């Protein structure tokens, strides 16, 4: 069995539920409104449009969130942690590798303006989904690629898009996709200072970078 001390040194190893930090019962305090969309409540309620939710992990959530809030049809974004064991973790706890969580962006979108398939195309093309427990220079389980689906339809579309993107990656000489695709677990929202971080700090770090490979146009639309 891998020991806790080994995970602290090698953050590419997922902890077990028994090894994970205990966390806490209290969620992080969040601002009421989205920093970019101003009058839009960060977590709703959302009264206009055909609202749906998507959850993506593609490396550091600062840069990922910015790319999604820039997309027409997205009405709100929130960053957080998901896929692990520790309830309501702090950023420092996630960075330790002892929570099992990956950094994610919860994307709130209007299906009449942008489809889930279009968001999936963005997801695949914005990062390198073949790198396992890392994304570029960001190394550890918290940077693993993930799609967490809020419905069976999303799960089906996510897997189909993965297979299509794998075909394109293979043609370009890339390896196998390591993206975790599953039904949505609990998303624990990150601390307030992480929300819309690059809008508050325009010169801040952004580790997002794709492979240059694109999905075929026929798979990018509705």
UniProtKB/Swiss-Prot annotation:
Pfam families: PMSR (PF01625). The keyword Oxidoreductase applies. Keywords: Oxidoreductase. The keyword S-adenosyl-L-methionine does not apply. Gene3D superfamilies: Peptide methionine sulphoxide reductase MsrA (3.30.1060.10). Transmembrane segments: none annotated. GO terms for molecular function: L-methionine-(S)-S-oxide reductase activity; peptide-methionine (S)-S-oxide reductase activity. The active site is at 60. One of its GO terms (biological process) is cellular response to oxidative stress. It catalyses: L-methionyl-[protein] + [thioredoxin]-disulfide + H2O = L-methionyl-(S)-S-oxide-[protein] + [thioredoxin]-dithiol; [thioredoxin]-disulfide + L-methionine + H2O = L-methionine (S)-S-oxide + [thioredoxin]-dithiol. Has an important function as a repair enzyme for proteins that have been inactivated by oxidation. Catalyzes the reversible oxidation-reduction of methionine sulfoxide in proteins to methionine. This is Peptide methionine sulfoxide reductase MsrA. It comes from Pseudomonas putida (strain ATCC 47054 / DSM 6125 / CFBP 8728 / NCIMB 11950 / KT2440).
């Amino acid at each position: 069995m891998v020991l806790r001390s080994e995970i602290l040194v090698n953050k590419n190893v997922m902890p077990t539920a028994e090894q994970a930090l205990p966390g806490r019962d209290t969620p992080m305090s969040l601002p009421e409104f989205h920093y970019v969309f101003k009058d839009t409540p960060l977590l709703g309620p959302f009264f206009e449009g055909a609202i749906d939710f998507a959850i993506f992990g593609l490396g550091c959530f600062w840069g990922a969130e910015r790319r999604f809030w820039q997309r027409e049809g997205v009405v709100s974004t929130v960053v957080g942690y998901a896929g692990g064991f520790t309830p309501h973790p702090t950023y420092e706890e996630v960075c330790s590798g002892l929570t099992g969580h990956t950094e994610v962006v919860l994307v709130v979108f209007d299906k009449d303006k942008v489809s889930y398939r279009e968001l999936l195309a963005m997801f695949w093309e914005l990062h390198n989904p073949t790198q396992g427990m890392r994304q570029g220079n960001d190394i550890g389980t918290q940077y693993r690629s993930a799609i967490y689906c809020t419905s069976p339809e999303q799960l089906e579309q996510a897997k189909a898009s993965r297979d299509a993107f794998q075909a394109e990656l293979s043609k370009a000489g890339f390896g196998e996709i390591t993206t975790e695709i599953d039904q949505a677990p609990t998303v624990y929202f990150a601390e307030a200072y992480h929300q819309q971080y690059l809008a508050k700090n325009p010169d801040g770090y952004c580790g997002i970078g794709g492979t240059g490979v694109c999905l075929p146009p026929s798979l990018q639309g509705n």
